[in-house]
Protein backbone atom coordinates (compact mmCIF):
# COMPACT_ATOMS: atom_id res chain seq x y z
CA UNK A 1 0.00 0.00 0.00
CA UNK A 2 1.32 3.45 -0.94
CA UNK A 3 1.79 5.88 1.91
CA UNK A 4 -0.87 8.52 2.52
CA UNK A 5 0.55 11.84 3.70
CA UNK A 6 -1.02 14.63 5.70
CA UNK A 7 -0.56 18.18 4.42
CA UNK A 8 -1.11 21.20 6.63
CA UNK A 9 -1.74 23.76 3.89
CA UNK A 10 -1.14 26.98 5.80
CA UNK A 11 -1.52 30.65 4.97
CA UNK A 12 2.08 31.36 5.96
CA UNK A 13 3.77 27.94 6.00
CA UNK A 14 2.83 24.41 4.94
CA UNK A 15 4.00 21.06 6.33
CA UNK A 16 3.87 17.39 5.43
CA UNK A 17 3.53 14.43 7.79
CA UNK A 18 3.31 10.64 7.52
CA UNK A 19 2.44 7.88 9.99
CA UNK A 20 5.11 5.19 10.28
CA UNK A 21 6.98 3.23 12.94
CA UNK A 22 4.12 3.79 15.37
CA UNK A 23 4.10 7.58 15.28
CA UNK A 24 3.36 10.65 13.21
CA UNK A 25 6.56 11.80 11.52
CA UNK A 26 7.12 15.25 10.04
CA UNK A 27 8.63 15.38 6.56
CA UNK A 28 11.61 17.70 5.99
CA UNK A 29 11.83 19.67 2.77
CA UNK A 30 14.84 20.00 0.49
CA UNK A 31 16.28 22.67 2.82
CA UNK A 32 16.08 20.48 5.93
CA UNK A 33 13.14 22.39 7.41
CA UNK A 34 9.68 21.10 8.24
CA UNK A 35 8.18 24.47 7.28
CA UNK A 36 7.73 25.32 3.60
CA UNK A 37 6.65 28.95 3.12
CA UNK A 38 3.33 29.17 1.23
CA UNK A 39 4.82 31.62 -1.23
CA UNK A 40 5.09 31.57 -5.04
CA UNK A 41 7.25 33.81 -7.20
CA UNK A 42 7.74 34.08 -10.95
CA UNK A 43 11.13 34.95 -12.42
CA UNK A 44 11.57 37.30 -15.36
CA UNK A 45 11.89 34.33 -17.72
CA UNK A 46 8.59 32.84 -16.50
CA UNK A 47 9.92 30.18 -14.11
CA UNK A 48 7.80 29.52 -10.99
CA UNK A 49 9.59 29.31 -7.64
CA UNK A 50 7.95 27.88 -4.51
CA UNK A 51 8.78 27.93 -0.80
CA UNK A 52 11.80 29.55 0.86
CA UNK A 53 13.45 30.84 -2.36
CA UNK A 54 10.13 32.48 -3.25
CA UNK A 55 9.80 33.98 0.23
CA UNK A 56 13.27 35.50 -0.13
CA UNK A 57 11.96 37.35 -3.21
CA UNK A 58 9.13 39.01 -1.25
CA UNK A 59 11.63 41.75 -0.45
CA UNK A 60 13.57 41.91 -3.71
CA UNK A 61 10.71 41.24 -6.16
CA UNK A 62 7.42 42.00 -4.32
CA UNK A 63 5.55 42.65 -7.57
CA UNK A 64 6.41 39.15 -8.86
CA UNK A 65 5.80 37.28 -5.59
CA UNK A 66 2.53 36.29 -3.89
CA UNK A 67 1.75 35.03 -0.40
CA UNK A 68 -1.28 34.59 1.89
CA UNK A 69 -3.34 33.50 -1.13
CA UNK A 70 -4.98 30.71 0.87
CA UNK A 71 -7.37 33.26 2.39
CA UNK A 72 -8.90 33.79 -1.07
CA UNK A 73 -9.48 30.13 -1.90
CA UNK A 74 -12.83 29.66 -3.64
CA UNK A 75 -13.44 33.38 -4.15
CA UNK A 76 -12.45 33.62 -7.81
CA UNK A 77 -9.84 36.27 -7.03
CA UNK A 78 -6.73 35.97 -9.18
CA UNK A 79 -3.09 36.93 -8.60
CA UNK A 80 -0.57 38.00 -11.20
CA UNK A 81 3.05 37.41 -10.13
CA UNK A 82 4.20 37.96 -13.71
CA UNK A 83 2.60 37.85 -17.12
CA UNK A 84 0.09 35.14 -16.19
CA UNK A 85 -2.82 35.23 -13.71
CA UNK A 86 -3.34 32.45 -11.15
CA UNK A 87 -6.28 31.48 -8.97
CA UNK A 88 -5.46 30.77 -5.29
CA UNK A 89 -6.05 27.03 -5.82
CA UNK A 90 -3.55 27.06 -8.70
CA UNK A 91 -0.95 28.71 -6.49
CA UNK A 92 -1.80 26.32 -3.64
CA UNK A 93 -1.34 23.36 -5.99
CA UNK A 94 2.29 24.42 -6.47
CA UNK A 95 2.83 24.39 -2.69
CA UNK A 96 1.11 20.99 -2.40
CA UNK A 97 3.22 19.61 -5.24
CA UNK A 98 6.37 20.82 -3.47
CA UNK A 99 5.33 19.04 -0.25
CA UNK A 100 4.49 15.84 -2.17
CA UNK A 101 7.85 15.84 -3.97
CA UNK A 102 9.68 16.33 -0.67
CA UNK A 103 7.68 13.42 0.80
CA UNK A 104 8.50 11.17 -2.15
CA UNK A 105 12.19 11.98 -1.85
CA UNK A 106 12.13 11.42 1.92
CA UNK A 107 10.09 8.20 1.91
CA UNK A 108 11.48 6.80 -1.33
CA UNK A 109 8.05 5.97 -2.75
CA UNK A 110 5.29 7.48 -4.86
CA UNK A 111 2.55 9.48 -3.14
CA UNK A 112 -0.90 9.52 -4.71
CA UNK A 113 -3.18 10.35 -1.76
CA UNK A 114 -3.21 13.02 0.91
CA UNK A 115 -5.28 14.25 3.83
CA UNK A 116 -5.31 18.06 3.83
CA UNK A 117 -6.32 20.43 6.62
CA UNK A 118 -8.40 23.58 6.20
CA UNK A 119 -9.57 26.30 8.58
CA UNK A 120 -12.70 25.11 10.38
CA UNK A 121 -14.56 28.14 9.04
CA UNK A 122 -13.86 27.39 5.38
CA UNK A 123 -17.18 27.11 3.54
CA UNK A 124 -18.01 24.51 0.89
CA UNK A 125 -16.62 26.46 -2.09
CA UNK A 126 -13.31 26.89 -0.27
CA UNK A 127 -13.13 23.19 0.60
CA UNK A 128 -13.85 22.26 -3.02
CA UNK A 129 -11.06 24.65 -4.07
CA UNK A 130 -8.63 22.82 -1.76
CA UNK A 131 -9.58 19.49 -3.35
CA UNK A 132 -9.08 21.05 -6.78
CA UNK A 133 -5.64 22.27 -5.70
CA UNK A 134 -4.78 18.69 -4.78
CA UNK A 135 -6.00 17.42 -8.14
CA UNK A 136 -3.94 20.08 -9.96
CA UNK A 137 -0.93 18.87 -7.96
CA UNK A 138 -1.59 15.34 -9.19
CA UNK A 139 -2.87 13.75 -5.98
CA UNK A 140 -6.21 12.50 -4.70
CA UNK A 141 -7.39 14.35 -1.58
CA UNK A 142 -8.69 11.48 0.52
CA UNK A 143 -10.13 13.65 3.28
CA UNK A 144 -10.44 17.28 4.34
CA UNK A 145 -9.89 17.79 8.08
CA UNK A 146 -10.50 20.96 10.07
CA UNK A 147 -7.20 22.33 11.38
CA UNK A 148 -8.18 22.56 15.08
CA UNK A 149 -9.63 19.03 14.88
CA UNK A 150 -6.25 17.70 13.76
CA UNK A 151 -4.58 19.63 16.59
CA UNK A 152 -7.09 18.15 19.07
CA UNK A 153 -6.32 14.61 17.91
CA UNK A 154 -2.57 15.20 18.28
CA UNK A 155 -3.01 16.62 21.79
CA UNK A 156 -5.38 13.90 22.99
CA UNK A 157 -3.25 11.10 21.52
CA UNK A 158 -0.35 12.42 23.62
CA UNK A 159 -2.23 13.15 26.87
CA UNK A 160 -4.99 10.49 26.57
CA UNK A 161 -7.01 12.16 29.33
CA UNK A 162 -10.78 12.62 29.23
CA UNK A 163 -11.54 16.34 29.19
CA UNK A 164 -13.28 19.28 27.58
CA UNK A 165 -10.63 20.81 25.35
CA UNK A 166 -10.61 24.16 23.58
CA UNK A 167 -8.24 24.32 20.62
CA UNK A 168 -7.05 27.84 19.84
CA UNK A 169 -5.63 27.64 16.31
CA UNK A 170 -4.08 30.97 15.35
CA UNK A 171 -2.16 30.97 12.09
CA UNK A 172 -0.73 33.66 9.88
CA UNK A 173 -4.04 34.45 8.22
CA UNK A 174 -6.85 32.65 10.04
CA UNK A 175 -8.21 32.03 13.54
CA UNK A 176 -10.17 28.89 14.42
CA UNK A 177 -11.51 27.93 17.82
CA UNK A 178 -12.97 24.48 18.47
CA UNK A 179 -14.54 22.93 21.55
CA UNK A 180 -13.67 19.26 21.75
CA UNK A 181 -14.96 16.42 23.93
CA UNK A 182 -12.24 13.78 24.39
CA UNK A 183 -13.04 10.35 25.86
CA UNK A 184 -11.94 6.74 25.32
CA UNK A 185 -10.71 6.66 21.69
CA UNK A 186 -13.15 9.36 20.60
CA UNK A 187 -12.30 12.95 19.71
CA UNK A 188 -15.64 14.66 19.14
CA UNK A 189 -15.83 18.23 17.87
CA UNK A 190 -18.64 19.97 19.75
CA UNK A 191 -18.52 23.42 18.13
CA UNK A 192 -16.34 25.58 15.92
CA UNK A 193 -16.02 29.30 15.35
CA UNK A 194 -13.55 31.26 13.31
CA UNK A 195 -12.44 34.30 11.40
CA UNK A 196 -10.79 33.65 8.03
CA UNK A 197 -9.49 37.23 7.91
CA UNK A 198 -7.71 37.38 11.25
CA UNK A 199 -4.21 36.07 11.87
CA UNK A 200 -0.68 36.88 12.93
CA UNK A 201 -0.11 38.82 9.70
CA UNK A 202 -2.61 41.40 10.98
CA UNK A 203 -0.29 42.18 13.88
CA UNK A 204 2.54 42.80 11.38
CA UNK A 205 0.33 45.23 9.44
CA UNK A 206 -0.80 46.86 12.68
CA UNK A 207 2.78 47.51 13.80
CA UNK A 208 3.65 48.87 10.34
CA UNK A 209 0.62 51.19 10.27
CA UNK A 210 1.31 52.58 13.74
CA UNK A 211 4.97 53.08 12.79
CA UNK A 212 4.01 55.15 9.74
CA UNK A 213 1.40 57.12 11.69
CA UNK A 214 3.88 57.89 14.47
CA UNK A 215 6.27 59.43 11.96
CA UNK A 216 3.62 61.19 9.87
CA UNK A 217 4.30 59.09 6.78
CA UNK A 218 1.44 58.16 4.44
CA UNK A 219 1.29 54.60 3.12
CA UNK A 220 1.12 56.01 -0.43
CA UNK A 221 4.61 57.49 -0.01
CA UNK A 222 6.18 54.04 0.08
CA UNK A 223 7.17 52.07 -2.98
CA UNK A 224 6.14 48.40 -3.05
CA UNK A 225 9.62 47.26 -2.07
CA UNK A 226 9.83 49.78 0.80
CA UNK A 227 6.50 48.58 2.20
CA UNK A 228 7.61 44.95 1.89
CA UNK A 229 10.73 45.79 3.91
CA UNK A 230 8.60 47.64 6.49
CA UNK A 231 6.34 44.59 6.92
CA UNK A 232 9.42 42.42 7.32
CA UNK A 233 10.71 44.77 10.03
CA UNK A 234 7.31 44.68 11.73
CA UNK A 235 7.34 40.87 11.71
CA UNK A 236 10.87 40.91 13.14
CA UNK A 237 9.75 43.32 15.87
CA UNK A 238 6.81 41.05 16.77
CA UNK A 239 9.05 37.98 16.98
CA UNK A 240 11.80 39.72 18.99
CA UNK A 241 9.24 40.77 21.57
CA UNK A 242 8.94 37.04 22.30
CA UNK A 243 12.51 37.16 23.59
CA UNK A 244 13.13 40.78 24.63
CA UNK A 245 11.32 43.39 26.73
CA UNK A 246 12.10 46.16 24.26
CA UNK A 247 12.74 46.28 20.52
CA UNK A 248 13.90 49.18 18.34
CA UNK A 249 12.39 49.08 14.85
CA UNK A 250 14.09 50.86 11.92
CA UNK A 251 12.74 51.62 8.46
CA UNK A 252 13.79 53.84 5.57
CA UNK A 253 11.32 55.81 3.48
CA UNK A 254 12.93 57.59 0.56
CA UNK A 255 16.22 58.78 2.01
CA UNK A 256 14.88 59.26 5.54
CA UNK A 257 15.58 56.72 8.32
CA UNK A 258 12.93 56.38 11.04
CA UNK A 259 12.96 54.40 14.26
CA UNK A 260 10.51 53.52 17.03
CA UNK A 261 10.77 51.63 20.30
CA UNK A 262 8.28 48.85 21.04
CA UNK A 263 7.48 47.08 24.30
CA UNK A 264 4.97 44.35 25.10
CA UNK A 265 2.78 46.94 26.86
CA UNK A 266 2.76 49.16 23.77
CA UNK A 267 1.91 46.22 21.51
CA UNK A 268 -0.94 45.26 23.85
CA UNK A 269 -2.40 48.77 23.76
CA UNK A 270 -2.19 49.00 19.96
CA UNK A 271 -3.64 45.50 19.55
CA UNK A 272 -6.80 45.90 21.64
CA UNK A 273 -9.12 45.90 18.61
CA UNK A 274 -7.58 42.65 17.31
CA UNK A 275 -7.74 41.05 20.76
CA UNK A 276 -11.42 41.98 20.97
CA UNK A 277 -12.02 40.12 17.69
CA UNK A 278 -10.23 37.09 19.13
CA UNK A 279 -12.43 37.18 22.23
CA UNK A 280 -15.57 37.34 20.06
CA UNK A 281 -14.57 34.17 18.19
CA UNK A 282 -13.92 32.34 21.48
CA UNK A 283 -17.29 33.56 22.77
CA UNK A 284 -19.12 32.19 19.72
CA UNK A 285 -17.49 28.77 20.09
CA UNK A 286 -18.44 28.60 23.78
CA UNK A 287 -22.00 29.75 23.12
CA UNK A 288 -22.53 27.24 20.30
CA UNK A 289 -21.07 24.47 22.46
CA UNK A 290 -23.28 25.50 25.41
CA UNK A 291 -20.23 25.89 27.64
CA UNK A 292 -18.65 28.62 29.70
CA UNK A 293 -14.98 29.41 30.19
CA UNK A 294 -15.13 27.46 33.47
CA UNK A 295 -16.21 24.26 31.66
CA UNK A 296 -12.97 24.15 29.66
CA UNK A 297 -10.40 21.82 31.23
CA UNK A 298 -7.56 22.53 28.80
CA UNK A 299 -6.72 25.20 26.23
CA UNK A 300 -4.43 23.90 23.47
CA UNK A 301 -2.43 26.39 21.41
CA UNK A 302 -1.91 25.56 17.73
CA UNK A 303 -0.72 27.53 14.70
CA UNK A 304 2.46 29.56 14.37
CA UNK A 305 0.98 32.85 15.59
CA UNK A 306 -0.18 31.30 18.88
CA UNK A 307 3.49 31.36 19.91
CA UNK A 308 3.23 35.12 20.46
CA UNK A 309 3.63 35.85 24.21
CA UNK A 310 0.96 38.55 23.83
CA UNK A 311 -1.55 35.93 22.64
CA UNK A 312 -0.62 33.38 25.30
CA UNK A 313 -0.87 36.05 28.00
CA UNK A 314 -4.30 37.09 26.71
CA UNK A 315 -5.57 33.49 26.67
CA UNK A 316 -4.26 33.00 30.22
CA UNK A 317 -6.13 36.17 31.23
CA UNK A 318 -9.40 34.98 29.65
CA UNK A 319 -9.37 31.41 30.99
CA UNK A 320 -7.55 32.02 34.29
CA UNK A 321 -5.20 29.14 33.49
CA UNK A 322 -2.04 28.64 31.47
CA UNK A 323 -2.68 27.24 27.97
CA UNK A 324 -0.89 24.11 26.82
CA UNK A 325 1.90 24.84 24.37
CA UNK A 326 2.91 21.40 23.10
CA UNK A 327 6.28 21.39 21.36
CA UNK A 328 6.25 23.66 18.33
CA UNK A 329 2.81 25.19 17.72
CA UNK A 330 3.60 25.28 13.98
CA UNK A 331 3.74 21.48 13.86
CA UNK A 332 0.74 20.35 15.93
CA UNK A 333 -1.81 20.32 13.09
CA UNK A 334 0.53 18.41 10.76
CA UNK A 335 1.18 15.82 13.50
CA UNK A 336 -2.58 15.40 13.91
CA UNK A 337 -2.93 14.84 10.17
CA UNK A 338 -0.22 12.19 10.40
CA UNK A 339 -2.37 10.41 12.99
CA UNK A 340 -5.40 10.67 10.68
CA UNK A 341 -3.29 8.94 8.02
CA UNK A 342 -2.47 6.20 10.54
CA UNK A 343 -6.17 5.68 11.29
CA UNK A 344 -6.94 5.50 7.56
CA UNK A 345 -4.20 2.95 7.00
CA UNK A 346 -5.56 0.91 9.95
CA UNK A 347 -2.29 1.00 11.87
CA UNK A 348 -2.73 -1.26 14.90
CA UNK A 349 -1.87 1.23 17.67
CA UNK A 350 -4.26 3.90 16.39
CA UNK A 351 -6.89 2.15 14.25
CA UNK A 352 -9.61 2.43 16.93
CA UNK A 353 -9.38 6.22 17.23
CA UNK A 354 -12.34 8.12 15.84
CA UNK A 355 -12.33 11.82 14.93
CA UNK A 356 -15.83 13.20 14.41
CA UNK A 357 -15.50 16.50 12.57
CA UNK A 358 -18.15 19.09 11.79
CA UNK A 359 -18.57 21.79 9.17
CA UNK A 360 -20.01 25.09 10.45
CA UNK A 361 -21.82 25.71 7.15
CA UNK A 362 -24.57 23.81 5.39
CA UNK A 363 -23.24 21.74 2.49
Predicted regions and their residues:
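Oxyanion-binding/catalytic loops of NTP- or PPi-dependent enzymes
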Residues: 1-75, 79-85, 94, 101-363
